[in-house]
A protein has these predicted regions:
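Residues that define the transmembrane beta-barrel architecture of outer-membrane proteins
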Residues: 106-108, 146-151, 176-182, 216-222, ...
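Outer-membrane beta-barrel translocator domains and adjoining extracellular loop/strand segments
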Residues: 124-129, 177-182, 211-217, 251-261, ...
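Extracellular loop and loop/strand-boundary signature of outer-membrane beta-barrel proteins
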Residues: 138-141, 168-170, 208-213, 298-302, ...
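Outer-membrane beta-barrel translocator/channel fold
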Residues: 199-292, 296, 356
Length: 365
């Protein structure tokens, strides 16, 4: 009796893409750790929250009271509103986004992409004083740009059961701030290319801001996306899509130095009997020489409740072979959430509506 030849079992093709995805995610985690420890020179769009204090009258920050024995900080009643509004608009700038139609990539699919995004901000409002590029003693002299630009890269990996996982990072241009982003998508309905049925997907995403010690900012999003694909000339494929996104923004203050001109260690180490050494100190803290009074100048904005924003978006993906280009427009409604429990009274989100335009290009592998 002739022996039967056993056929080799084919290897599944999704192992290599998953290995590559794991490598990229690991790389993003390493990048995040490096950015969190980074102490690079601040640029014009980096946060500087002490600028939210009005010093235009030439008397220094009105929040600060310095005496020979102590330094105290008392925020003005509108300070928490300015902080909340700034976190709201910055949260929209770095909110999770991935410009894609509703269809997933399939369990063996993987996508690599790069994107550029410009998001409108209320640059003329006082809460945008809280960046490095604004001079607090003359805040109208230089203002932030009306549109903030972010650039980034993303990877998407298809999974079984109509699931898809994605990760990426974006940089706020002219700043040291980055946001690490990730999302999970589930396609409720997809693949009916020959029927007049649209694809429908739901998605949950998260974005964490790194590269600043002024604040921690976490943005969570839940999306609903609907799309329909069309073939063009048997070569191109066009997939228009529309969607709605609910954003939940959690912003918390870091430790802020209200007397940045005074170094607490230098002040404490200065002999008050040494007139030359005392004269070398900034005038505002000369009376505190030899004391630890300047340490009272560190403060935090009070914790606040979640900020909620709604965003509508639409775009189209144009694909040729493995190459694709996506254009998207988004509109986020003006903020209106309120936290009535802060120690200084209610903090209102006074952010304006924000438009955004994005372009993304890459490869479907």
């Amino acid at each position: 009796m002739a022996s039967r030849r056993l056929r080799p079992v084919p290897r599944l093709g999704w192992r290599a893409p998953i290995t590559g995805l794991r490598g990229l995610v690991a790389g993003l985690l390493v990048l995040g750790a490096l950015l969190a420890a980074r102490t690079a020179r601040a640029d014009r769009n980096d946060l500087r929250l002490i600028n939210l204090c009005d010093t235009s009258q030439g008397n220094g920050c009105g929040w600060v009271t310095q005496t020979p024995t102590r330094t105290t900080v008392a925020l003005d009643p509108a300070a928490n509103t300015r902080f909340r509004s700034l976190m709201s608009e910055l949260g929209v700038v770095v909110a999770p986004r991935l410009q894609t139609p509703a269809d997933t990539l399939g369990f063996a699919g993987i996508q690599l992409s790069a994107d550029v995004n410009v998001t409108q901000i209320s640059s003329g409002k006082s809460f945008w004083n809280g960046v490095e590029g604004v001079q607090p003693n003359n805040p109208n002299l230089t203002r932030p740009p009306s549109w903030l630009t972010t650039v980034g890269g993303f990877v998407r990996k298809g999974l079984p059961a109509s699931l898809e996982l994605g990760a990426g990072a974006v940089n706020v241009v002219q700043s040291g701030m980055w946001a690490l982003q990730g999302y999970l998508r589930f396609a409720v309905n997809e693949g009916f290319h020959d029927l007049p049925l649209p694809s429908l997907a739901v998605q949950a995403g998260v974005s964490d801001l790194l590269g600043t010690d002024q604040a921690t900012l976490h943005v969570y999003g839940v999306d609903v996306v609907v799309s329909k694909g069309f073939g063009i000339a048997g070569t191109w494929r066009l997939q228009p899509y529309l969607g709605w996104n609910q954003l939940l923004i959690s912003g918390a203050s870091g430790t802020i130095d209200a007397t940045p001109a005074c170094d607490a260690a230098t002040v404490a180490g200065t002999n008050p009997a040494n007139n030359v050494a005392v004269a070398a100190l900034p005038r505002s803290c000369q009376a505190q020489a030899g004391t630890s009074a300047d340490e009272g100048g560190n403060f935090r904005f009070p914790s606040q409740a979640l900020i909620t924003r709604s965003r509508w978006f639409g775009g189209a993906k144009l694909k040729l072979w493995k190459l694709f280009l996506v254009g998207q427009f988004a509109w986020t409604t003006a903020g209106g959430s309120r936290d009535a429990q802060t120690p200084m009274g209610a903090a209102d989100d006074q952010s304006g509506s924000q438009k955004a335009v994005s372009l993304s290009a890459g490869f479907d592998l």
